[in-house]
């Protein structure tokens, strides 16, 4: 358990690579779409999405990450199979790519900074994060909004509850290469903090392409689903997820 806790402290928000629903959605889509393509992960964290892109035959893979220690760890795992960009997304000129992968770290769709305060003290550079709409605006400005994935969004007003628990990672439930990544490089990591989500009522308030996303507020919890052309969903209100309804409407 001590080793498990040390790894979670090291990764802080990047431990989402142990979430099987997240890994399965990304791996399924990557397996069908990256062969012979140039791919960048915008916030590579553990490096698992870059690992998947390499395994499924991407022509070139870039890992963009602002945290130096995570770049160092990725290099230990991925070596020279990817090119590393140690920089902040919104302050960086990106290479031309066919696919731009992104992921939202937190249950708080509009306010990632509020979530990150659980991990970092005020004034820490890690709190200098952009809003999801900043990413959308940046992608439009730099002409890759139609290459940004996941690319479809559903927002909803939800009444329900999320309970946090530690649960076995259940390697058997992960995709082939996601499972291999964890087995080969994080075999000591056996437990993950997850949300068990209960949805009592749900009203969809918006659904569309991420390029048309605008700020919306609800009186209850804000439920969200991100998907790849309406397939392979990740969500903060699936029955079990590392995202939850815990952080309010915002």
Predicted regions: what they are:
Residues 36:
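Phosphate-coordination loops involved in phosphoryl transfer and adenosine-cofactor binding
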Residues 2-31, 39-42, 49-50, 54-56, ...:
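Class I SAM-binding transferase module
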């Amino acid at each position: 358990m001590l080793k498990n806790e040390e790894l979670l402290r090291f990764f802080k928000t990047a431990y989402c690579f142990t979430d099987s629903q997240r890994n399965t959605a990304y791996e399924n889509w990557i397996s069908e779409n990256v062969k012979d393509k140039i791919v960048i992960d915008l916030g590579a964290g553990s490096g698992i999405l870059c690992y998947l892109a390499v395994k499924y035959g991407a022509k070139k893979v870039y890992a963009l990450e602002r945290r130096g220690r995570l770049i160092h760890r990725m290099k230990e795992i991925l070596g020279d199979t990817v090119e590393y960009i140690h920089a902040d997304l919104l302050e960086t000129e990106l290479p031309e790519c066919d696919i731009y992968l992104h992921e939202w770290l937190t249950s708080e769709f509009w306010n990632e900074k509020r979530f990150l305060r659980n991990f970092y003290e005020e004034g820490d550079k890690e709190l200098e994060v952009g809003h999801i709409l900043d990413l959308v605006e940046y992608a439009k400005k730099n002409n890759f909004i139609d290459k940004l994935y996941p690319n479809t969004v559903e927002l909803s007003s939800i009444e329900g509850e999320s309970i946090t628990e530690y649960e076995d990672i259940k390697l058997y439930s992960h995709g082939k290469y996601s499972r291999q990544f964890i087995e080969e490089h994080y075999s000591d990591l056996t437990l993950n903090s997850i949300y068990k989500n209960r949805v009592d009522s749900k009203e969809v308030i918006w659904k569309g392409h991420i390029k048309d996303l605008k700020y919306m507020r609800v009186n209850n919890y804000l439920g969200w689903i991100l998907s790849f052309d309406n397939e392979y969903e990740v969500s903060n209100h699936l029955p079990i997820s590392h995202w939850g309804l815990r952080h309010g409407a915002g």
